[in-house]
């Protein structure tokens, strides 16, 4: 379980970090190499989920969606200095519960 959580976090950081660099390049006139590095990081994001032990592509990517929401709230708070409000935190907790149910609910 620890391995899965680490991979979810790494993938989320790669997705958000890569996307953020592309955003800075295109929206805030940063140098072209921001976009190149961001694109390479996004390719890495595409590879990381393949390291998961869960057999279902759909389930893994759905779970990444929930983790992404949580990490995006934290990224916005830490990097963009946008303090999350109560609704942001409530939404993040709901996503975390959903991810937990999807991945670790007992199945036959």
Curated annotation (Swiss-Prot):
Intracellular or extracellular location(s): Cell membrane
Membrane topology: Multi-pass membrane protein
Pfam families per UniProt: UPF0060
Source organism of this protein record: Desulfitobacterium hafniense (strain Y51)
HAMAP family: UPF0060
Keyword set includes Cell wall biogenesis/degradation: no
Chief site of localization: membrane
InterPro entries: UPF0060
Coiled coil start-end: none
Membrane-traversing stretches: 5-25, 31-51, 60-80, 86-106
Protein name listed in UniProt: UPF0060 membrane protein DSY4629
Keywords, comma-separated and alphabetical: Cell membrane, Membrane, Transmembrane, Transmembrane helix
Highest taxon, organism lineage: Bacteria
Protein family (similarity comment): Belongs to the UPF0060 family.
CC per GO annotation: plasma membrane
